[in-house]
């Protein structure tokens, strides 16, 4: 993991999208092949998933990877602010 505050930190809205769809962490984890603990770590930003896992999360949540994850140095969806 990169140091706190690094401009290249990956941030996400996995929890926001998951809750909007009424899914539990366990349900999402089962769908994408992860444990509930792994989903918690991703949602809290303690773990950045692989490209394959990010794609599976996006598919399971019916959205795109760039709507779920972006670099903190840019704005939402990676756009510079």
Where are these regions (language model features)?
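Short, charged recognition helix plus adjacent turn
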Residues: 2, 69-81
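DNA major-groove recognition helix of helix-turn-helix/homeodomain DNA-binding modules
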Residues: 52-67
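Short amphipathic helical patch at the helix-1/turn junction of helix-turn-helix
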Residues: 8, 19-20, 48
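Short basic helix-loop element that most often maps to the first helix and adjoining turn
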Residues: 12-31
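Recognition helix of helix-turn-helix/homeodomain-like DNA-binding domains
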Residues: 34-47
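Residues in the helix-turn-helix
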Residues: 27, 38, 67
């Amino acid at each position: 993991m990169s140091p706190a505050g690094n401009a290249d930190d990956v941030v996400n809205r996995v929890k926001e999208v998951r809750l909007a769809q009424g899914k539990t962490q366990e349900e999402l984890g089962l769908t994408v092949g992860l444990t509930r603990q792994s989903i918690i770590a991703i949602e809290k930003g303690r773990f950045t998933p692989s490209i394959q896992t990010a794609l599976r999360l996006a598919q399971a949540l019916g959205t795109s990877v760039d709507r779920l994850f972006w670099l903190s140095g840019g704005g939402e969806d990676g756009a510079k602010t």
